[in-house]
Amino acid sequence: GWGFTAVEANAFVSSPEMLERLAQGPLPIASLHNPIPNPRSPRGMSSIDLNLCSLDSDEWREAVGLALGTIEQAARLGAHAIVLHMGHVPVGRETARLLHDLWHEGRTKSKEYIDAQLRIPEVRAKTAPQHLERAIETVQELTGPARDAGVLLGIETRHNLHEIPNIDEMELMLAECDPAVVGYWHDTGHAATHERLGYTTHA
C-alpha cells in the first residue's frame, strides 16, 4: 500500500487544472494548504506570499478573498480542513535568512549568529501587536464561511521568527477564535527549525 490514506494539496498547486488532476488521483484530499489554487498575484508575487495579517487593506482583502476561495474548494472536494499561514511582520526577513545560513554552516556559537538571534525579536516587537490583531480579524472573518462549509481552519506553526503567530501569539489567537472551527496545525519541520535556531523548545 501507500503507507498513508490521504494527501494534502499544498500551494504548489498553481492552477484549477492541477487541482483537478490531484483530485482524480488514487487518494482523497484531506486538507488544502491556502491558497488553492495559488495563482500569480497582480502584485507580481506568488499568492502564497500575500500577507493575511497585512496592514495594507488592499493586500489584506486580496489575501482574504483567496482564503475564502480555498474554503470553497475544500468543501467541493470533501477536504476537512484548510491550513493557514497567517503572514508576517514586514521586517527581519534578511536576518531570519542569515540565521538559517549560519546554522547550516555550523556557526551557532558565533557573535554574528547570537547578535542576529537577539535582533529579530527586538525589531519584530515594534509592530507585531498590530499584525496579530489583523491576523485575529482575518480568522474571525473566515470562521463563518468555514463553519457553513463544514471546513476546519488550521493555523500552522510558523517557520521564521518574523512570521505571525509565534507560539505565545498562537495561544492569544486561539483564545479569540471559535474552537469548533479553528485550531492549531502542527508542522513538525517548522517546529524543529525553531528549536534548532534557538527560538523555542520543540516539545
Regions found by a protein language model. Give the residues of each.
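Catalytic domains of carbohydrate-active enzymes, especially glycoside hydrolases
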Residues: G1-S15, R76-A81
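Acidic-and-aromatic substrate-binding clefts and catalytic sites of carbohydrate-active enzymes
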Residues: A6-E20, P39-R40, P90-G92, N160-N166, ...
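Alpha/beta catalytic barrel-like cores
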Residues: F12, M45-S54
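Active-site acidic/histidine proton-transfer and metal-coordination neighborhood
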Residues: L52-H186
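Non-cysteine beta-strand/loop elements that form the S-adenosyl-L-methionine
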Residues: I29-P39, L84, Y184-D187, A203
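Short, hinge-like loop/turn segments at secondary-structure boundaries
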Residues: A23-P26, I48-L50, H100-D101, E171-M173, ...
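Short, acidic/polar
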Residues: G1, S15-M18, E62-Q73, A135, ...
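Aromatic-lined substrate-binding rim segments of carbohydrate-active enzymes
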Residues: P16-H33
